[in-house]
Amino acid sequence: GELKNKDIQEETHQVMHNLKNILQEAGMDFSDVVKTTIFITDMHQFGAVNEVYGKYFENRQSDRQPAFPARETVQVSALPKFVNVEISMIAVKL
C-alpha cells in the first residue's frame, strides 16, 4: 500500500503496530522479542522514535528478561518508499 507522509512518531507507531500484527499471527507478542534493529534517516529524531518504541515494551519486564530487547539504532541515508523509520525484529517463542 501507499504510505502517507507522517511525522516520525506517527511512522514509528505504524511500524510498531504492523510488527505487533506480525507477532500475533505467529502466536507471539512483544515479550517474545529478543533483538531489534532500528533504521532512521535522521539521528536527531532518535528521541522521538525511542519514546514511541519504549511504550510497546512497558509491560515486558520480568525475572526472566530485561525490560527491553537487545537493540541497535542505525542512521541510513534513505529507506524504501521515502519513510523515515524501519524496524527489524527477531522474536523467539520459548
For each predicted feature, which ranges?
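Short, polar/acidic, helix-capping and beta-turn segments at strand->helix junctions
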Residues: 1-94
